[in-house]
């Protein structure tokens, strides 16, 4: 079986909820999966008891998956999936740079913007694909146990655009693993469309400490969410992003209504008093706004509140 002979390296860091979902599905469908995490308890639980995934896909414990805290064990894989938080992408890329990746593909899937730029600081990007997880919401319930609220589509594309044979191969692998996946000619469009949704909910949910549905059930919180998204949309328009929608407000509300119980990963980080992905999401709107001379008052305030709170528990 071609699936059984295919090696897949699933690379993710501590509290790797999304990486756990990905790895579980690939292993369940007979791919050879080795996960990397720096969290000893999570790795030990996976190796001793298997990886439990509960949620929209049911409740299943996958015993065929393996995990390690030793990055060098990931050598000689066909596919590396970087499912870390955005600020850890550079660290992973710096370690991958020591491997021979001439016949491998690196697929990086993050919230926000800037993953490709972080990777290219440490390694060439000709073998790097970009991915967007659409309609996913995941969290770690305990070591060895991941939960997910949604699972719509894995969208994948070449950094420089276009449809290629290798893109088709990777998309087919995701399909074989049980995901809905599709290759796109313009991945930047999709990254920006996901970015706008992240901006709409990550920051506001973290500031108000509410789920997406709770934000949408309050007109004042919804207004903050919408205005954050509109600021991001304006920047995308200036960057000539070819958006698939005109009505940004409707787009983000429709997106949110599909996962009302979800807590964005930024809120999960805030609640757990961990460093969050602010600089890649709402903070990125502020950064790009300064570069393009566009005022971003809603994202500026949201970012300042989250940053100020973060200083209280991260020294």
Q: What are these language model-derived features?
A:
Residues 10-59:
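NAD(P)+-binding Rossmann beta1-loop-alpha1 motif at the extreme N-terminus of oxidoreductases
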Residues 176, 224-315:
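NAD(P)-dependent Rossmann-like dehydrogenase/reductase catalytic/cofactor-binding core
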Residues 41, 87-88, 113-114, 162, ...:
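Short alpha-helical
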Residues 1-12:
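Single conserved hydrophobic/aromatic residue that forms the stacking wall/gate
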Residues 24, 28, 94-98, 121, ...:
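Short, well-ordered alpha-helices that flank and scaffold nucleotide-derived cofactor binding pockets
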Residues 99, 122-127, 142-245:
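Internal alpha-helical scaffold of NAD(P)-dependent oxidoreductase catalytic cores
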Residues 36, 60-145:
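Rossmann-like NAD(P)(H) cofactor-binding subdomain of soluble oxidoreductases
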